[in-house]
Structure formats: structure tokens, C-alpha cells
């Protein structure tokens, strides 16, 4: 039996009234069941709750042992990059579109979450990527990503030229619109749209997926997650950027390299006991059903 939870954080950035309804339902239901509940500050303001315990994401990460994220995958990504630094488990209620990371159906969330609170769940450890934009001297600019790190032009889309080194060994040079470096978690996101492979969550692997390469021989490459990836630029005619989960942008200047590696942090994502990854793929991607 899994360890029971005692302190639960409610997280999310509500964009419409139905999401706020879910936040309020969760708060009142969990407090009625006797749990200590910390609600993210913005949600408490939106709901006009008074006399409640509120906190930032970091404070929830330090204090709670479970965070419930209400929203879509974008909300989950933003919260997860912070919560992954702490010893806290995370589960999501889907109020977005696809919801690869948010398992719970909002119409049945209370019953599904009740089962989880009784210990009827399992934990998946999802690793993050760390991207550093650095030069020979000076402090690097650092970002982390749950899904992917993307090299792309900063303003106007155009072809860029760069070299890729894996564990400091030259791998290939490329002329393309950019490069997606994806975790298994991100393999069903931007990487999939660019023709990248789907990596099951338990794989210790990273996918390198070219974006519109100017050669037919450029193909996605899957490497061990323990590898370090370095991107080098011989000359830069315009601003380039590294983006993390399409939420954090790090500009790249002349004479700077980009270093990408597996982060020391990981996300403790929990699922209901009846969760099946391949059922999720089938339903979200519209795969054909079983024939017999």
C-alpha cells in the first residue's frame, strides 16, 4: 500500500469558469475530508477565498506531499518544472485539450482522486532536460524542460546552420529550421508533430528531431539519456533562441554554445491504478481499435 497523503496542494492557472469550478470543488471536498490544503495564491484570489492557506508553487513543493494540477498539459508543464525540485507527487485533472499529462477526467475526478488518496495509484519518474547557453567565461543562462528543448530562430523563421556534438564527439552538422531535443514525455508533443518517434515514458532516452532539414538524409536520432549534447555555431547571421517547453526562452549570442543534458531533477507523476499508457496513446491520437 502506498503511503497516505496528509497535505495537498491545489495548482493551476484558471482560464475559464469551469476550471475555477473544479478548483473550488477540490478545495471544499478535500478540506471536508480533513486534509491540510494549500491553494496556489492566484487561484485563491480568483475564487475570493478568505482565511485559507495559500502559497507559491515553491512553497507548495516544500510543504505538501501531493499537488493536484487542474488544467491542460501547458499548466502541468509550468507547474512541473518547479515542483520537480521537491519531494512531492503530482497528478493532473484535465481541463485542456489532449491531456497526455493530466489523467483525471473532470467529470469523474472526485471518485478517481478518492481512490488515489486511498493509496490506489502508482508513480512514474519522468526526467527533465537542462539547457545551458554558455561561453568560455561567465555564468551560463539555464532553463529546464519536461517536454523538449528547441533550437530555433529568434524572430523570423529561416534556415540556420549548426553542429551537434554528443559526449563531445562530433555527430553531424545540419542546415534546417531548428532542432527539437525531446524527453520521452515530450515525444508525444512538438517532437511528434515534427515526425519524431514516440518513446515510452520508462525509456532512458533522448530524441533529436530535425525541423525541416535541407537534406533527405537527416533523420531523428535517439540517444541514451546519460549523453550530453552540445550545439555549436560557426557564424550567426541573426538571433537564435533555445526554448524550454515553449514557455522559457534563452537567447543565443555570438560565440556561445548550447549544452543540453539530463537534469538532476525528476517529476514524480502519479497515475490511477487502471492507467494504461497505450490506451492513452490510442484515445488521444485516434489509433484504430483492436480487431479481435
Curated annotation (Swiss-Prot):
GO molecular function: ATP binding; metal ion binding; NAD binding; NAD+ kinase activity
Enzyme class label: transferase
EC assignment: 2.7.1.23
Alphabetical UniProt keywords: ATP-binding, Cytoplasm, Kinase, NAD, NADP, Nucleotide-binding, Transferase
Highest rank taxon of the organism: Bacteria
Catalyses which reaction(s): NAD(+) + ATP = ADP + NADP(+) + H(+)
Cellular-component GO terms for this entry: cytoplasm
Cofactor dependency: a divalent metal cation
Active site: 73 (proton acceptor)
UniProt cross-references to SUPFAM superfamilies, sorted A to Z: NAD kinase/diacylglycerol kinase-like (SSF111331)
Gene Ontology BP terms: NAD metabolic process; NADP biosynthetic process
Compartment(s): Cytoplasm
Function text: Involved in the regulation of the intracellular balance of NAD and NADP, and is a key enzyme in the biosynthesis of NADP. Catalyzes specifically the phosphorylation on 2'-hydroxyl of the adenosine moiety of NAD to yield NADP.
UniProt-recorded name of the protein: NAD kinase
Phylogenetic classification of the source organism: Bacteria, Pseudomonadati, Pseudomonadota, Gammaproteobacteria, Enterobacterales
Amino acid at each position: 500500500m502506498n503511503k497516505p497523503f496528509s497535505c495537498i496542494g491545489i495548482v493551476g492557472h484558471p482560464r475559464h469558469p469551469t476550471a475555477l469550478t473544479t478548483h473550488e470543488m477540490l478545495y471544499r471536498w478535500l478540506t471536508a475530508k480533513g486534509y491540510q490544503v494549500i491553494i496556489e495564491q492566484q487561484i485563491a484570489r480568483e475564487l475570493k477565498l478568505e482565511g485559507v492557506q495559500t502559497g507559491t508553487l515553491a512553497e507548495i513543493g516544500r510543504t505538501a506531499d501531493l499537488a493536484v494540477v487542474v488544467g491542460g498539459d501547458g499548466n502541468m508543464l509550468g507547474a512541473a518544472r518547479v515542483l520537480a525540485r521537491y519531494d512531492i507527487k503530482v497528478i493532473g485533472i484535465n481541463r485542456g485539450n489532449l491531456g497526455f499529462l493530466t489523467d483525471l477526467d473532470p467529470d469523474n475526478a472526485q471518485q478517481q482522486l478518492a481512490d488515489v488518496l486511498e493509496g490506489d495509484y502508482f508513480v512514474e519518474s519522468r526526467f527533465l532536460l537542462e539547457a545551458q547557453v554558455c561561453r568560455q567565461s561567465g555564468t551560463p543562462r539555464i532553463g529546464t524542460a519536461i517536454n523538449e528543448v528547441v533550437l530555433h530562430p529568434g524572430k523570423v523563421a529561416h534556415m540556420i546552420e549548426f553542429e551537434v556534438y554528443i559526449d563531445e564527439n562530433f555527430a553531424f552538422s545540419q542546415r534546417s529550421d531548428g532542432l527539437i531535443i525531446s524527453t520521452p514525455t515530450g515525444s508525444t508533443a512538438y517532437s511528434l508533430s515534427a515526425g519524431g518517434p514516440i518513446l515510452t515514458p520508462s525509456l532512458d532516452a533522448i530524441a533529436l528531431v530535425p525541423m525541416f532539414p535541407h537534406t533527405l538524409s537527416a533523420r531523428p536520432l535517439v540517444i541514451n539519456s546519460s549523453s550530453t549534447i552540445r550545439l555549436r555555431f560557426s557564424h550567426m547571421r541573426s538571433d537564435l533562441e533555445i526554448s524550454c517547453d515553449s514557455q522559457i526562452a534563452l537567447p543565443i549570442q555570438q560565440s556561445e554554445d548550447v549544452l543540453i543534458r539530463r537534469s538532476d531533477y525528476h517529476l514524480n507523476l502519479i497515475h490511477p491504478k487502471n492507467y494504461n499508457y497505450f490506451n492513452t496513446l490510442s484515445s488521444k491520437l485516434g489509433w484504430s481499435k483492436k480487431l479481435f
